[in-house]
């Protein structure tokens, strides 16, 4: 096969070859940050999923006892003053309130998912209560 002569062609604006040696030297010459490491951050949603699993496993009450007791006494004042409560009565109220709220939030989440959302909104709570027959 006969050799052909190579002719010079006009450049079409391609990438210029990088100067790797100059870049390495510039990195070494630049002052370092002093070894300060950034704090570790989880991806968005990872911690939320971990909390969901943790609270679904647990059985302890999630509302603090004393603030709940104050709220019960404040609401009871509207009906009759000087009411007294056994501690077991307030405990039973708190158990039932938390069970109700958990089931309401489960239904609310289903309403949000039905609307093709992952964030619950007040209209989801209203719809869940309406479907349960709690609010007309």
Curated annotation (Swiss-Prot):
Which positions bear Phosphoserine?
11
Stretches the record annotates as Disordered: 1-42
Has keyword Nucleus? yes
Name the UniProt record assigns to this protein = Histone H3
- Gene3D superfamilies from the UniProt entry: Histone, subunit A
Subcellular localization(s) per the UniProt record: Nucleus; Chromosome
Q: What keywords are annotated for this sequence in UniProt? A: Acetylation, Chromosome, DNA-binding, Methylation, Nucleosome core, Nucleus, Phosphoprotein
Q: Which residues carry this modification: N6-acetyllysine?
A: 10, 15, 19, 24, 28, 37, 57, 65
Q: Give the originating organism.
A: Coccidioides immitis (strain RS) (Valley fever fungus)
| Similarity-based family | Belongs to the histone H3 family.
């Amino acid at each position: 096969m006969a050799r052909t002569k190579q002719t010079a062609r006009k450049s079409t604006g391609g990438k210029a070859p990088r100067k790797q040696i100059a870049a390495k030297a510039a990195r070494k010459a630049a002052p370092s940050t002093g070894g300060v490491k950034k704090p570790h951050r989880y991806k968005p949603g990872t911690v939320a999923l971990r909390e969901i699993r943790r609270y679904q496993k647990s059985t302890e009450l999630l509302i603090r006892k004393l603030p709940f007791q104050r709220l019960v006494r404040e609401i009871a004042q509207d009906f009759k003053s000087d009411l007294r409560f056994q501690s077991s009565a307030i405990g039973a109220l708190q158990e039932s309130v938390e069970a109700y709220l958990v089931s309401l939030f489960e239904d609310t989440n289903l309403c949000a998912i039905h609307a093709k959302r992952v964030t619950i909104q007040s209209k989801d709570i209203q719809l869940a209560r309406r479907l349960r027959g709690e609010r007309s």
